Structure formats: structure tokens, C-alpha cells
Amino acid sequence: MTLTKVELADNLIEKLHLNKRDAKELVENFFEEIRVALETGEDVKLSGFGNFELRDKSSRPGRNPKTGESVPVSARRVVAFKPGQKLRARVEKTKPKS
């Protein structure tokens, strides 16, 4: 199962008794704040959850999987998520789905 933004909004409606429009707006604004922070080069630290950070990847040689041809992979910036200790501990307690 995958948790979507719509389901997050539905959970806010149920748990916080928000109306649908406010819940959807809250979810959208939350993620927009994270996007804007990352776009401006800031790391995002969510206490008890984890950190979103920017990492610069250097250029490197790559390979086209279809042809086997060597192709350069250009330098780029990527977003990485590092879970916090509390999140890691809670996830480690869960049983894997079979």
C-alpha cells in the first residue's frame, strides 16, 4: 500500500476535523515549503522524522543498458532523505509484508 497526498488530507479531516479544502491546502502547503527550501539550497530537518538534504554528484562514466555503450553521466544535484533515529526505530519494529 502507498500513502498518497489525498490519503494524508483524508487523515487530517478525520483526526483534526478539518474541512476537505483546508486539509488539502495544508498538505499542499507543507510539501511546497519543503520544495522551496530545497530549491533555495536549504536542508530540511523534521525532528523525530528525518532530514532532506541536497547532495552534489560529480560527473562519472556510465553505460547505456541497451547498447552497452559508454556514456558520460553529467554532474547533478540530488535530494537525499536520511531517516531520524525515532523513525528508524519504529520502522525496525514492524514486520515485513510477505
From Swiss-Prot:
Gene3D superfamilies: IHF-like DNA-binding proteins (4.10.520.10)
UniProtKB keywords: DNA recombination, DNA-binding, Transcription, Transcription regulation, Translation regulation
InterPro entries reported in the protein's UniProt record: Hist_DNA-bd, Histone-like_DNA-bd_CS, IHF-like_DNA-bd_dom_sf, IHF_alpha
Disulphide-bridged cysteine pairs: none
GO MF annotations, alphabetized: DNA binding; structural constituent of chromatin
NCBIfam families: himA, PRK00285.1
Assembly description: Heterodimer of an alpha and a beta chain.
Purpose: This protein is one of the two subunits of integration host factor, a specific DNA-binding protein that functions in genetic recombination as well as in transcriptional and translational control.
The family this protein is said to belong to: Belongs to the bacterial histone-like protein family.
Protein name in the entry: Integration host factor subunit alpha
Organism: Pasteurella multocida (strain Pm70)
